[in-house]
Swiss-Prot record:
GO molecular function terms listed in the Swiss-Prot or TrEMBL record: transmembrane transporter activity
Transmembrane helix listed as a keyword: yes
Pfam families in the record: MFS_1
Family named by the database record: Belongs to the major facilitator superfamily.
GO CC aspect terms: membrane
Protein name as it appears in the record: Solute carrier family 49 member A3
InterPro entries in alphabetical order: FLVCR1-2_SLC49-like, MFS, MFS_dom, MFS_trans_sf
Subcellular localization, as worded in the UniProt entry: Membrane
The keyword Transmembrane helix is annotated on this UniProt entry: yes
Gene that produces this protein: slc49a3
Keywords: Membrane, Transmembrane, Transmembrane helix, Transport
Transmembrane segments: 41-61, 81-101, 109-129, 150-170, 181-201, 206-226, 264-284, 296-316, 330-350, 355-375, 390-410, 437-457
Lineage top rank: taxon: Eukaryota
Length: 482
């Protein structure tokens, strides 16, 4: 009896086909061998670089919002819209991105998004080119919005591909880890932007340096994606679910998702988490400003927020790959995130408590970001056989919609904050606001969403069950042949 399932890495011949030692997959499915390829790590690396650069471009102005507003002679609200435009554009584009990923495949999604990302980053640099901005004009902000809009179109493609990548290229015991690595490269970009922007923009004129710095990795990602990704899937699938990869038609899949009770609960609660964390990432500098914390400290807190998020996501990803306890991990992280959000809403009201604020930001990232990769895998598990692009994409679209609502709501709940002297974070003290009420509402939303998910979310792991049944059928066929 030939061995049917192989998890070892295989080499490839010059024609790009796998070198198999046993039977090749037959059309009737009764003989199949699963293979993994070293090339999957290159594809993962390109997606990570692309996702990281896209996030850097998104959040690049938020850590230096006050300096940006002064340089381009606009209000803080306009600077906030540079981040908000990502969420607004991602909603209509998200449905097209889900269709493209599930219909045309990973290759086209990655290459197309990399070109949008690169062109958008270059257009942003037009804001500081003297020839394009005559003296006395305020056209620079329009170049920023145009570039941000192109990068925003790329974002859904970038955010929706990790689950598809994990399913198509990685075996079942590596899927959650691959999803974690690809997913967390996006907050890595946020982390780097929180460090780079305040470090570079110590003076208004250094805005030009910042724009140039963020363009370089976007160009590199485009070159690697265009030249290096040659196929939308490996020649031989890595798992049973990848072998049986035919998913529901796009419209039928969306309809099936919206009638799946477990998925709808996950979509709304997971989306709420995305929306809240998007708002915190965009406003962190302004949230800490009203108690006298500097831009640099806000950048450090943002970096800690993401760094500990990596740790949480990494640990949870490895744990879930080995135990398959998706529900338990996500519910635990939701509960701990809710408790930490309450602590965050309280500690930001104290002055000169840098250690305490930094610790709470670290814990918020540790528990909050751990939900993302495991939550995406859980979305696929509870909605199988709907395509991965659709199941994760709809959850992210929910997050973008809620992100817009929360960003507008939190800004409306702020109050002008009177200062007795210049703030260490703001050049224009009339535009410093008290965010304490907004953060209390944020904590309430986190707590409510966590309770809903913990109490009402229940599901079977449909993809894992399908793989178990498939492998069991193969073993039965092989036994009869022997």
């Amino acid at each position: 009896m030939a061995e049917d399932v192989s998890s070892g890495e295989q080499t490839e011949d010059q024609a790009g086909q796998p070198l198999l030692n046993g039977e090749i997959i037959a059309s009737n499915g009764d003989k199949c061998q699963f293979r993994t390829y070293k090339r999957r790590w290159f594809v993962l690396g390109v997606i990570c670089l692309l996702s990281c650069t896209n996030a850097m471009l998104w959040i690049s102005f938020a850590p230096v919002a006050d300096v940006t507003a002064s340089f381009f002679k606009c209000s803080l609200d306009v600077v906030n819209y540079l981040s908000l435009v990502y969420l607004i554009i991602a909603i209509p584009v998200g449905f097209g991105a889900s269709w493209l990923i599930d219909t045309l495949g990973l290759k086209y999604a990655i290459v197309f998004s990399s070109w949008l990302n690169m062109i958008g980053s270059i257009i942003r640099c037009g804001a500081i080119v003297p020839y394009l901005n005559p003296s006395g004009s305020y056209t620079g902000i329009y170049y920023l919005f145009t570039g941000q809009s192109l990068c925003a179109i790329a974002q859904p493609l970038v955010l929706f591909v990790p689950a598809k990548l994990a399913s198509v290229w990685f075996p079942e015991h590596q899927r959650a880890t691959a999803n974690m690595i690809a997913s967390m490269s996006n907050p890595l970009g946020v982390l780097l932007a929180n460090i780079i922007s305040p470090s570079v923009v110590t003076k208004e004129e250094y805005i030009a340096h910042m724009l140039g710095i963020y363009t370089v990795p976007a160009i590199a990602a485009c070159i690697l994606a265009t030249a290096g990704i040659r196929a939308k899937s490996p020649p031989t699938p890595p798992s049973a679910s990848a072998f049986n990869s035919a998913s529901e038609p796009f419209i039928a899949g969306i309809r099936q998702l919206l009638t799946n009770r477990a998925y709808v609960i996950l979509m709304l609660c997971f989306g709420a988490g995305i929306g809240i964390f998007t708002a915190i990432s965009s406003f962190l500098e302004q949230i800490l400003c009203f108690r006298g914390y500097s831009n640099l400290f806000a950048g450090v807190c943002g970096a800690l927020f993401i760094f500990f998020g990596f740790i949480g996501a990494f640990v949870c990803g490895l744990y879930v790959d080995r135990t398959k306890k998706f529900k338990e991990v996500v519910k635990t992280c939701f509960a701990l995130t809710a408790l930490t959000s309450i602590a965050f809403a309280l500690v930001i009201n104290f002055r000169e408590q840098t250690v305490l604020v930094a610790c709470v930001c670290s814990l918020l990232g540790l528990f909050g970001f751990a939900i993302s990769p495991v939550g995406m895998e859980l979305a696929v598990e509870c909605s199988y056989p709907v395509g991965e692009g659709s199941s994760t994409g709809l959850a992210f679209i929910s997050g973008q919609i809620q992100g817009i609502i929360y960003m507008i709501l939190f800004q409306k709940l702020t109050r002008p904050f009177a200062t007795s002297g210049p703030s260490p974070c703001g050049m224009n003290q009339t535009e410093i606001y008290d965010w304490s009420t907004s953060m209390l509402v944020m904590a309430a939303l986190c707590s409510f969403g966590s309770c809903i998910f913990i109490i009402f979310f229940h599901t079977k792991y449909k993809r894992l069950l399908a793989e178990v049944n498939f492998n069991g059928l193969k073993e039965e066929l092989n036994t009869h042949e022997t």
